[in-house]
C-alpha cells in the first residue's frame, strides 16, 4: 500500500518544494531541517497543499481527520473541512481537559506519549491521520494504534513531507500513505 503523489497533486509538487526553506544544522548539527513556514505564508501554495491532501481522500467517506500536535493542527482542520469531516486533535500528555486514552511509544532515546479524548472516536468510524512530516513513522504508527484502540478504521495517512531516506513506510505497511513531497536527504 501507500501511494506517491499523483495526478494534479504531483504536478504541483515542484512548486511546493520551492516554497520550503532548507535550514542546515537545525535543530542540531548535521540535521537538514525542512521549514514549512515559508510554504504556509504563500496563499497559493497553502491552498494547493490542502487541495491535494483532501483530493487524495475525497472518495473515501472519511468521518474524522486526526491531526497530530502541533503541525497536524495546521493542516488537519482545513482537510477536515474539505472532506466534510470532523477534526480530532491528538496531543501531548496533559493537554486535553476530559478523560483520555493514551499510547506510549519508543523513540530512539526514550519514550513519548500521545493522548486523545476517550470519546473522540466511535467504533467503526473511518479516519485519516494528517501531519506535516513522515520521518521514521513512529508518531504515525502510535497515532494509528491509539485511534484503533478506540475502534477507528484507519482509511489512510496524509503528509506534506516524507523523508524517504529514513524508510518510514516499513512501520506502516498496512496503511494507505499519501505524501505530497519526498526528500532523499
Where are these regions (language model features)?
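PRPP-dependent phosphoribosyltransferase catalytic core
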Residues: 2-8, 12, 18, 141-185
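Short, glycine/charge-rich flexible loops or terminal/linker lids adjacent to PRPP-binding catalytic cores
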Residues: 85-128
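Residue-level signature of catalytic and energy-coupling elements of molecular machines
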Residues: 30, 65, 87, 157
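Conserved acidic residues
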Residues: 63, 125, 155
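Short glycine-rich phosphate-binding loop at a beta-alpha junction
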Residues: 62-69
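Short Gly/Thr/Asp-enriched flexible loops that form oxyanion-binding sites at enzyme active sites
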Residues: 74-85
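Conserved G/P- and acidic residue-centered "switch" motifs that form tight phosphate/ATP-binding loops
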Residues: 132, 137
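Active-site-facing substrate-recognition patch
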Residues: 2-62
Amino acid at each position: 500500500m501507500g501511494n506517491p503523489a499523483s495526478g494534479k497533486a504531483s504536478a504541483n509538487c515542484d512548486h511546493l518544494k520551492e516554497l520550503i526553506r532548507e535550514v542546515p544544522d537545525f535543530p542540531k548539527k548535521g540535521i537538514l531541517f525542512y521549514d514549512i513556514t515559508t510554504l504556509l505564508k504563500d496563499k497559493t501554495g497553502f491552498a494547493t497543499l490542502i487541495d491535494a491532501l483532501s483530493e487524495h481522500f475525497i472518495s473515501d467517506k472519511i468521518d474524522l481527520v486526526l491531526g497530530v500536535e502541533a503541525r497536524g493542527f495546521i493542516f488537519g482542520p482545513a482537510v477536515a473541512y474539505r472532506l466534510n469531516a470532523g477534526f480530532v486533535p491528538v496531543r501531548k500528555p496533559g493537554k486535553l481537559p476530559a478523560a483520555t486514552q493514551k499510547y506510549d511509544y519508543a523513540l530512539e532515546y526514550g519514550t513519548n506519549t500521545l493522548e486523545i479524548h476517550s470519546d473522540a472516536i466511535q467504533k467503526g468510524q473511518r479516519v485519516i491521520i494528517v501531519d506535516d512530516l513522515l520521518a521514521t513513522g513512529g508518531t504515525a504508527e502510535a497515532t494509528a494504534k491509539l485511534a484503533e484502540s478506540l475502534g477507528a478504521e484507519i482509511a489512510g495517512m496524509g503528509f506534506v513531507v516524507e523523508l524517504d531516506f529514513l524508510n518510514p513506510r516499513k512501520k506502516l505497511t498496512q496503511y494507505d500513505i499519501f505524501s505530497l513531497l519526498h526528500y532523499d536527504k
